[in-house]
């Protein structure tokens, strides 16, 4: 006669615990798989929202998907040449490509002003169309190390390739109330209208203590967050240097955004 299962015995309790754990694991795994498409859709919408925001096209009533489709054209740029990549996949992500040795480059330490060690060979750029269909501004991704985190943001510039229309940071882990203020629209507003380059084409934008007195190129550093501010400066120095967007911006100036 088969021995009756005793759930109150040590072995019985262990079997029950393992069975419950297995069932819970299956449920959690199923939930993760089931929710992933929803999470990915939300991440995409959040990113599009930040792009629209830095372009000045976002308010509480904005239909993000519709406005993005109508006003934003995503292109992929070869950073080495500044040319558009014609056969790039629609879902190309420089952030993902940057983790693939075949799609990225190692940055020489002396050139790594942003402290990122490597970057993708290609990156997305976003052309913002006006009501007349003409390109009115270009949104460029930018990232670099702060005090505690990699700071990911967007910079909106005019078609002259020099004048800043806006900046935003959409992901960062700097100290709340200090370095975390890079996400404060009041500080971001200080960049609007600033020129990236001087008359000789050299990067002139600078972020530092008292830099705001330079009305054309300077932005005051965040109070109590010198290392985060230095990271912002380093990000601009790298991405708007010869190893970043300079080849692309030079082509914009000579041929136009189209």
From Swiss-Prot:
Q: Coiled-coil ranges per the record?
A: none
Q: Which reaction does it catalyse?
A: a ubiquinone + n Na(+)(in) + NADH + H(+) = a ubiquinol + n Na(+)(out) + NAD(+)
Provide the Gene Ontology terms for cellular component: plasma membrane
| Membrane topology listed for this record | Single-pass membrane protein
Arranged from A to Z, the UniProt key words for this protein are: Cell inner membrane, Cell membrane, Flavoprotein, FMN, Ion transport, Membrane, NAD, Phosphoprotein, Sodium, Sodium transport, Translocase, Transmembrane, Transmembrane helix, Transport, Ubiquinone
Q: Which is an annotated GO molecular function term of this record? A: FMN binding
The text of the family note is:
Belongs to the NqrC family.
The record describes its quaternary structure and partners as: Composed of six subunits; NqrA, NqrB, NqrC, NqrD, NqrE and NqrF.
Q: What exactly does this protein do?
A: NQR complex catalyzes the reduction of ubiquinone-1 to ubiquinol by two successive reactions, coupled with the transport of Na(+) ions from the cytoplasm to the periplasm. NqrA to NqrE are probably involved in the second step, the conversion of ubisemiquinone to ubiquinol.
Give the protein's recorded name.
Na(+)-translocating NADH-quinone reductase subunit C
Organism of derivation: Neisseria meningitidis serogroup A / serotype 4A (strain DSM 15465 / Z2491)
């Amino acid at each position: 006669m088969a021995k009756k299962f005793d759930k109150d015995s040590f072995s019985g309790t262990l079997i029950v615990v393992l069975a419950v754990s297995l069932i819970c694991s299956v449920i959690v795994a199923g939930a993760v798989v089931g929710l992933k498409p929803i999470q990915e859709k939300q991440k995409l919408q959040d990113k599009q929202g930040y792009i629209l925001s830095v372009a000045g096209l976002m308010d509480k009533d904005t239909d993000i998907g519709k406005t993005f489709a109508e006003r934003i054209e995503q292109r992929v740029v070869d950073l080495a040449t500044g040319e558009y990549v014609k056969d790039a996949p629609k879902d190309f992500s420089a952030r993902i490509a940057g983790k693939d040795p075949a799609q990225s480059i190692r940055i020489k330490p002396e050139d790594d002003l942003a402290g990122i060690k490597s970057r993708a060979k290609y990156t997305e750029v976003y052309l913002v169309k006006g009501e007349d269909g003409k390109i009115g501004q270009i949104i460029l991704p930018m990232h670099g190390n702060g005090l505690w985190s990699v700071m990911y943001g967007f910079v909106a510039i005019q078609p002259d390739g020099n004048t800043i229309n806006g900046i935003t940071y959409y992901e960062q882990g700097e100290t709340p109330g200090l370095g975390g203020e890079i996400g404060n629209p009041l500080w971001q507003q200080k960049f609007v209208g600033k020129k990236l380059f001087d008359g000789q084409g050299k990067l002139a934008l600078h972020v530092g203590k008292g830099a705001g007195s330079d009305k054309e190129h300077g932005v005051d550093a965040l109070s109590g967050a010198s290392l985060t501010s230095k990271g912002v400066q380093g990000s601009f120095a790298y991405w708007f240097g010869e190893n970043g967007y300079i080849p692309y911006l030079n082509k914009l100036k000579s041929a136009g955004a189209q």
